[in-house]
Amino acid sequence: MSERIVIKEICEVYDGPHATPKKTVDGPVYLGIDAITDDGKINAKEFAHLSEEDYIKWTKRVTPQYGDIVFSYEATLGRYALIPKDFYGCLGRRLAIIRNVSKDIDTLWLYYYFLSPEWKQFIQSKIIKGSTVNRISVEDFPTYTVPNISIKVQCKIANILSKIDEKIALNNNINDNLLAMAYDIYMYSFYGKIPNGKLKDILVEADKSSVQVGEAKQSTGEYPFFTSGSAILKWDTPFVNGRNCFLNTGGNADVKFYVGEAAYSTDTWCISSNKNMSDYLYLLLISIKPELNQKFFQGTGLKHLQKPLLKNRHIYIPDFEKLQIFNEQVNPMFNVISENTRENQELIVLRDWLLPMLMNGQATISD
């Protein structure tokens, strides 16, 4: 794979707008860096929006199309993602588009190459240090090179890696649907009930973790490691087992749930419940998530979760019979969600192992 081709011979590269429009509740998508994950996916939950009038202005440079590769070139560097079907929106600041115009290049293969360690290492050498933020030169980007291999081999590589990603996406979709069903059951069964206790009456706190997120990023352990971010990392040893909730303690409110052995970071509060109420506790916390942000996260600058305040929140505590009926319905759902999460972690490890091997030719695909 020593032969290479210059990007400008196969692609067009477009810089995005250099300003931020007024955000709206709905309308065309304003695609910001926050909506692109570290592992190369578009997270629609992070979409912002702008008006139709501003959309016209913000797409003068380029209108994102299905199959375009979007990448970040300033501040948060090196994020790449594919523009999905039916995307209607514009690029945000510090983003650019790579548009394949060659029949000899498979766009999906090119996308995966940009996620490879080889490319990441190369881009690291091209970073321009700034007084406030670092950046990659969009002007120089078209002069960089990628491997020049046959379209047949490109398609084989892309097919294998995309099949893994499709299975991960399917599991995530199943999990989203199961969570929505469990939440509906909770709301139908308990919404509007008169409080008869406090959160601290059912709360069980796990020991505080001493492991920083940065340490876990270097780990290749087998246990899921929960943080105050969206990504689930890995750790060598579990801190807890059973049915546990993991809450952000800084920034914005978020709650995760997992069944099984797991670990967590210093900025994550791990809690469960006595009386077999952990699943109930999780859905209760999800139901008050806006309140968590507005009332229980306080402080100047970076806000932090006020645990004593939250513990004293009045809640409804169901009796044994109601809880038993509820658990019979939702426990199996969360068991499946956690099984899918475990499978996804294994698939991610497989994909990330295969990616560099396929790209540098150490692994080949037979017909």
Named regions from a protein language model:
Residues 74-75, 230:
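Conserved "cap/hinge" positions at secondary-structure junctions
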Residues 89-109:
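Short peripheral tails and domain-boundary helices/loops at the edges of structured domains
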Residues 1-18, 143-227, 316, 320-366:
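Non-catalytic DNA-recognition/assembly elements of restriction-modification systems
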Residues 4-22, 34-69, 200-245, 251, ...:
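Sequence-specific dsDNA recognition surfaces
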Residues 77-84:
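Short, Lys/Arg- and Gly-enriched loop/turn segments at beta-strand edges
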Residues 108-139, 273-309, 366:
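Short, positively charged
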Residues 73, 89-96, 128-158, 264-267, ...:
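A short glycine-rich beta-alpha junction/loop motif
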